[in-house]
């Protein structure tokens, strides 16, 4: 008899797991509380402006392409992606700008401010990150390893210690090889992909730089939600039964097994396996009602990553100095990270990510206008949450900074504005305390590891998404879904022997 898989949540991790399980011959039902598939890969349109509500950068497209190839199909028949050789522009408080290109040589050619020594050091750093990327690909990515002990067993103690560079933090690894202060800050902010601090995260995450340089940075034509739509179409073609607007209220358990889910309609649906794309702690807390002692232990070890104050601005002018992806850096990177990740306050001078897809895709704003998305990282929801007044002051701080750094009269030109706070993120995606990127990567607390993909309490419960390994970001959460499918397939194959 065909076994039944229930997937809770239709984010990229959930939909990719559903696709792989269906491709493997299982009966798969996916329940998503919202009316769209993609989770944080969401869309907002108003007054002629289009905005990606969630992720705005596509990297490592081969991870997505694999899902289509398993069905002997081509992703290009479902969605169009475009490579962006000019990856982003960095603005610094003293007026310095640095353009990051795909390729160290190209970056050197486009930045007269960078010396020969700067480029040599940047190449040296890329070589270092390549070594880390290659070894993590062998075990962490290809085999879905979940713990330090598994990595040591797979690679051997000395090989793991040296090549994963567990001795240093990410920023220490950068500062050891890069002397240019602008490059130090720019490279450190690659940690944005996982919503953590480069001063706390382990050096193994330096691989993010090599991933982007080697695999490229891509734009999904028409908006990144089209990628989620493509995966949904593939899932339906493979026989996945998708229920949107369907909220799971709890997971039923018996001893060390999960037996099914209770929907908000009262209906009970049985399952042989459950895959939760809801974050691990909210799943245990709200769907299983795990005891307080075990929850507290998990919360200490797996603290949420950062959240964000997200502004979607329709602007009645154009700023020619902006690229597609932009970063407006802080005067003091260490202080910014300290305030967000340790003091848990709204930062005085935040580093701001600004995406302006209209630079590449003119369908995203009316002629002569621009669609600007602004995202500074801020703490996840605290026991004493930030107030409406706190957020209003922070909004002014953001606009003051952007105007000071070259976006002249930005306030005057805003004709449309939509804002998301951590509370909105928590409400819409049931994320842990409104975190965007799952679990924080911290060398001391968790060695940069997220939750394991297999539940430690229930033998047929699995997790996908940003709160489990291999981590946050679109390719990683998509990969987590594929890895969970591999684990279930391997388990079933073993049981049949």
From Swiss-Prot:
UniProt keyword list: Carotenoid biosynthesis, FAD, Flavoprotein, Oxidoreductase, Virulence
Pathway: Carotenoid biosynthesis; staphyloxanthin biosynthesis; staphyloxanthin from farnesyl diphosphate: step 3/5
Entry's EC annotation: 1.14.99.-
Catalytic activity: all-trans-4,4'-diaponeurosporene + 2 AH2 + 2 O2 = 4,4'-diaponeurosporenal + 2 A + 3 H2O
Matching InterPro entries: Amino_oxidase (IPR002937), Carotenoid/retinoid_OxRdtase (IPR014105), FAD/NAD-bd_sf (IPR036188)
Keyword Ribonucleoprotein belongs to the record: no
Record keyword Transferase present: no
GO biological process: carotenoid biosynthetic process
Pfam family, one: Amino_oxidase
Gene3D superfamilies the record matches: FAD/NAD(P)-binding domain (3.50.50.60)
Residues that hold FAD according to the record: 7-19
SUPFAM superfamilies xref list: FAD/NAD(P)-binding domain
The protein's required cofactors: FAD
Source domain of life: Bacteria
GO terms assigned for molecular function: oxidoreductase activity
Family listed: Belongs to the carotenoid/retinoid oxidoreductase family. CrtP subfamily.
Function description: Involved in the biosynthesis of the yellow-orange carotenoid staphyloxanthin, which plays a role in the virulence via its protective function against oxidative stress. Catalyzes the oxidation of the terminal methyl side group of 4,4'-diaponeurosporene to form 4,4'-diaponeurosporen-4-al.
Remaining remarks: Upon coexpression with Methylomonas 4,4'-diapophytoene desaturase (CrtN), CrtP produces 4,4'-diapolycopene dialdehyde, thus accepting 4,4'-diapolycopene as substrate.
Protein name: 4,4'-diaponeurosporene oxygenase
Organism in which the protein naturally occurs: Staphylococcus aureus (strain NCTC 8325 / PS 47)
